[in-house]
Amino acid sequence: IQLAGYYCYYEDPNPDAEYWYTQLLADAVPLAARLGVVMGIENVDGDDVTSLTKAMEFVDAVDSPYLQLYPDLGNIAEQGLDPGVELAAGRGHMVAMHAKDVRPGEPRRVEMGAGVVDWDRSFELLAAQGWSGRLMIEMWNDDVPDSLSRCAVARTFIEGRAASAGIAIVAP
């Protein structure tokens, strides 16, 4: 299950929000374990859990195989972070991944390949780690009439980049 790394989304966070976020993660682990569900913290845009380095603080604090990472490659780029540093921080803990393109200050609605994500480097780093897992393409097409064709183009783009780096693509 993907857990967004926002302490609060629609309102200003409480000064103790990080503490409560940690407590809620720890409280969720026994249920996740009982149900056999792995939770993954997504690094997000904004000011909360914006990096895999930060997300690993929660993973380490809770210390359960049922709490891991769900990286968003676009959010790494949008935050201006180094994918080499971030993906190394998450090594062995990345259970699934988001692929979306971004521009600085524009974390949504950027056409795949038109933003600043260094896809080749990111996928090469993941391949070097031997990473495999679910790779979801995050799209923000809202109500545009050609949403399906945009999704198909994005999928072809991402599959091509991942395959070029040596990441096996298995069709659903």
Positions of PLM-derived features:
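Active-site acidic/histidine proton-transfer and metal-coordination neighborhood
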Residues: I1-L69, E78, S149, A171
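Conserved beta-strand positions in the central sheet of alpha/beta enzyme cores
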Residues: I1-Q2, G40, V95-H98, M136
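Helix C-cap/helix->beta junction micro-motif
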Residues: R34-L35, P65, Q129-W131, A165
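Gly/Pro-rich active-site loop or hairpin
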Residues: D48, L52-M56, D60, N75-S132, ...
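Active-site glycine-centered loops adjacent to acidic/histidine catalytic or metal-binding residues
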Residues: D72
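Short, flexible loop/turn segments with low-complexity composition
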Residues: M139, A168-P172
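C-terminal helical cap(s) of enzyme catalytic domains, especially alpha/beta-barrels
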Residues: S147-A168
